[in-house]
Regions:
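SDR active-site lid
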Residues: 175-252
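The beta1-alpha1 cofactor-binding region of Rossmann-like NAD(H)/NADP(H)-dependent oxidoreductases
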Residues: 61-74, 105
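Conserved glycine-rich Rossmann-like NAD(P)H-binding loop of the short-chain dehydrogenase/reductase
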Residues: 31-46
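Substrate-binding pocket helix/loop in short-chain dehydrogenase/reductase
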Residues: 99-100, 107-109
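Active-site helix of classical SDR
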Residues: 123, 158-161
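Conserved NAD(P)H cofactor-binding loop of Rossmann-fold oxidoreductase domains
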Residues: 91-96
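Conserved glycine-rich cofactor-binding loop
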Residues: 17-18
């Protein structure tokens, strides 16, 4: 990976139509990168090229569709040519809140399809180009990968899987000079915050009377607490700036917290007992 910052280098970013991914793509472009972005959402991405002065191109790509991934990666690989790809930011992800007992299994599977298997498909498809450039992969995990929360089970579990995959990829790719970094954001204020609030409301409204008797009260507390901590989180532009720092950092970090809340919580996870963590887990989720 070249020491030259940005200029003349290339990056691919998934989940880039809005939110954190969009800011990452734009800030990489501002640093001189040529950015190949993708997202499953088209209508929210029309201004990316204009906003980046033509430095960002966006492909409508569903990362859970193997053929779509192969087509996008082939197009990008043709564009970068013999130089290969310098950076891949694997950012695409979704959030499926709710009590594990009542969430449809298909919803949990879909979260893993996007957050885990889709990410793996993109990473593996880009590896030949990344090996050529001796590039860097930045996988966007979350602090909940180390500190799972009640009513956030599928997301926490998928992010924990990314933690394990990061360790394995880092070891397997070291002989090729490809670096693998796991970014661990805390709470973020993005244009997806309203979507999360709507998802929480849909779960509550879909509960049967029996499910409400079991979980309604605690889920309402969680929803209120979750909305509060999200509103107090790092803004997407600030988080993206930190991600760009991680992209450029020499030497590459193994893991990197994004936001003061993530730094504090991950330190707590390292230092405290399981009993302390269980108590904090419920308190953080607004349940104690």
């Amino acid at each position: 990976m070249s020491d030259q910052v940005g200029q003349g280098r290339t990056a691919a970013v998934t989940g880039a139509a809005n939110g954190l991914g969009r800011e990452i793509a734009l800030q990489l472009a501002a640093q001189g990168y040529r950015v190949f972005a993708s997202d499953v959402v088209e209508q929210e991405s029309n201004d990316l090229c204009t906003a980046s002065n033509g430095q960002v191109s966006l492909s409508l790509t569903d990362i859970t569709d193997g053929d779509a991934v192969a087509t996008w990666v082939r197009d990008v690989t043709d564009e970068v040519g013999e130089a290969g790809l310098d950076v891949l930011v694997s950012n695409a992800g979704i959030l499926t809140p709710g009590p594990l007992e009542i969430l449809p299994l298909r919803a949990i599977k879909h979260e893993f399809d996007v957050n885990v298997f889709g990410g793996v498909a993109v990473i593996n498809a880009f590896l030949p180009a990344l090996r050529t450039a001796r590039g860097r992969i930045v996988s966007i995990g979350a602090m909940t990968g180390r500190f799972p929360l009640p009513f956030n089970g599928p997301s926490s579990a998928s992010k924990a899987t990314l933690e394990a995959l990061a360790d394995v990829y880092r070891a397997e790719l070291k002989p090729f000079g490809v670096q693998f970094v796991l970014a661990q954001p805390g709470n973020l204020v993005t244009d997806g915050t309203a979507k999360t609030a709507a998802a929480l409301q849909r779960v509550a409204e879909a509960m049967t009377d029996e499910q409400k008797a079991l979980y309604g009260g605690e889920f309402a507390k969680f929803s209120a607490a979750f909305s509060t901590v999200q509103s107090e989180g790092l803004h997407a532009q600030e988080a993206a700036a930190r991600i760009v720092e991680i992209v450029e950092a020499q030497p590459a970090p193994i893991r990197a917290a994004v936001g003061e809340d993530a730094e504090q919580l991950l330190r707590f996870v390292r230092e405290k007992s399981e009993e302390d963590l269980d108590e904090l887990r419920r308190r953080y989720a607004g349940l104690a």
